[in-house]
């Protein structure tokens, strides 16, 4: 598949031919990366695949859930309007874990998505459809959302590039909320340059999103500098949770960064067990509130019932999958009057501590290098308990808790030929430094789709 940078140079007729080619490839593919009918939001625009939790006017929006079957988006999300302004089109919807709650894209009502590198392996999640499509040659580029690693982890598992912007850098207006203080939309692309182009297209202040940062749209692509030398922190203490292939790739990446002239310094952070605990208290609490709106009354699936109480219970019981129900129950529990102080307030204090630790590291560092996941992409069905799945997020969730930007890129392959990804984490609104460092690493490795 051509890159986004190459597509920017094409005439409308050539783009139309590419869209026809994509439709054909998707119809023949077994990856299940796309869901529903492929609609084109802008004739003559560059096709960008959009995750199924972002509103595209006139297209069905399901968030991978039965409860939203048949719901058609009545408006465009801000990121879609920004794509249109840059001559890009929302072209198709990508499969995802139900309401973005998962790390494998197995919980979707549309069925699981396969990893294009090895179909017996998960593509990651929750933006697994976006990453699978980009890595599998079914999309030029895609949009995903990242609440605790949902852009970066599937990008790492499939072997493409995923950027989670700083919280507030990209408008969330039109994104179906999972955990509002953590969610962020970002690009999944074939290389770092494309990530910069798509990030520039969707970033900028939006008055319709109260958490949107009052900053001008970025111009990171024009300012990209792979020769910029930076101070990069490494966190050896956190590697004990990682498998051998990840540890080996991490230290090999450190050597490459040093050889490129970057300064490496060792730092330490709070034990990742606290990251996990705080994250799953906060995100489930927010989810239980956000998902209360899906009641069978206003939109989506409506069960047959004799009274209002029965309607609520039956619609939500039939419409939500097991993982979503689990997280709603957990969230309702931690917000209950007897446990609010013990769990929710304590988790907020840990979140503040994590942010302070990153602030301390960034006093004398430009970037932090970290694994994206403790293992390469696992096989389908290899995770036997929800806790095992949650522990797969140990390296990504702290970045969301602190609201920082981070980019995942492939740095090599395991002995089994599976992609290994690392992430560069930056200061708040420091996407330029993150992209510069990632481009330096990408060119040194020579590893891009």
UniProtKB/Swiss-Prot annotation:
Pfam families listed in its UniProt record: Amidase
Enzyme active site: 51, 126, 150
GO molecular function, one term: ATP binding
InterPro entries per the UniProt record, alphabetical: Amidase (IPR000120), Amidase_CS (IPR020556), Amidase_dom (IPR023631), AS_sf (IPR036928), GatA (IPR004412)
Keywords of this entry: ATP-binding, Ligase, Nucleotide-binding, Protein biosynthesis
Signal peptide range: none
Keyword Nucleotide-binding in record: yes
Region (Disordered): 103-128
Cellular component GO terms, alphabetical: glutamyl-tRNA(Gln) amidotransferase complex
Biological process according to GO: translation
Similarity comment: family membership: Belongs to the amidase family. GatA subfamily.
NCBIfam families on file: gatA
Protein name: Glutamyl-tRNA(Gln) amidotransferase subunit A
Underlying gene: gatA
């Amino acid at each position: 598949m051509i890159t986004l940078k190459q597509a920017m140079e094409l005439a409308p007729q050539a783009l139309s031919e590419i869209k026809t080619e994509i439709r054909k490839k998707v119809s023949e593919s077994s990856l299940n990366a796309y869901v529903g009918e492929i609609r084109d939001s802008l004739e003559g625009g560059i096709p960008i695949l959009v995750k199924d939790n972002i509103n595209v006017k006139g297209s069905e929006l399901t968030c991978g859930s039965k409860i939203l079957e048949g719901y058609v988006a009545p408006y465009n999300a801000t990121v879609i309007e920004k794509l249109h302004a840059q001559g890009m089109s929302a072209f198709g919807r990508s499969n995802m874990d139900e309401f973005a709650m998962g790390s494998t894209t197995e919980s979707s009502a549309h069925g699981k998505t396969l990893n294009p590198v090895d179909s017996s392996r998960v593509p990651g999640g929750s933006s697994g459809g976006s990453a699978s499509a980009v890595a599998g040659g079914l999309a030029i580029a895609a949009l995903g959302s990242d609440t605790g690693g949902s852009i970066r982890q599937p990008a790492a598992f499939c072997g493409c590039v995923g950027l989670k912007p700083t919280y507030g850098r990209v408008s969330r207006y039109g994104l179906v909320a999972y955990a509002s203080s953590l969610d962020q939309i970002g690009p999944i692309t074939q290389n770092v340059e494309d990530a910069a182009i798509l990030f520039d297209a969707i970033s900028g202040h939006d008055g319709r999103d109260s958490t949107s940062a009052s900053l001008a749209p970025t111009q990171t692509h024009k300012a990209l500098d792979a020769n910029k030398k930076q101070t990069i922190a490494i966190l050896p203490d956190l590697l004990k949770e990682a498998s051998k292939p990840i540890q080996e790739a991490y230290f090999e990446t450190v050597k490459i960064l040093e050889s490129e002239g970057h300064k490496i310094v060792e730092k330490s952070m709070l034990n990742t067990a606290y990251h996990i605990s705080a994250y799953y208290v906060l995100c489930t609490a927010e989810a239980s509130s956000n998902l209360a709106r899906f009641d069978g009354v206003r939109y989506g699936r409506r069960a047959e019932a004799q009274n209002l109480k029965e309607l609520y219970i039956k619609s939500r019981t039939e419409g939500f999958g097991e993982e979503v129900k689990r997280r709603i129950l957990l969230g309702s529990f931690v917000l209950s009057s007897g446990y609010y102080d013990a769990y929710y307030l304590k988790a907020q204090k840990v979140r503040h501590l994590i942010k302070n630790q990153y602030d301390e590291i960034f006093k004398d560092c430009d970037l932090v290098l970290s694994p994206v996941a403790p293992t390469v992409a696992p096989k389908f069905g290899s995770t036997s308990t929800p806790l095992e799945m949650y522990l797969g997020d140990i390296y990504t969730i702290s970045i969301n808790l602190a609201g920082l930007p981070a980019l995942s890129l492939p740095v090599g392959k395991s002995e089994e030929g599976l992609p290994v990804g690392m992430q560069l984490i930056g200061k708040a609104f420091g996407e330029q430094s993150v992209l510069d460092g990632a481009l330096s690493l990408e060119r040194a490795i020579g590893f891009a789709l």
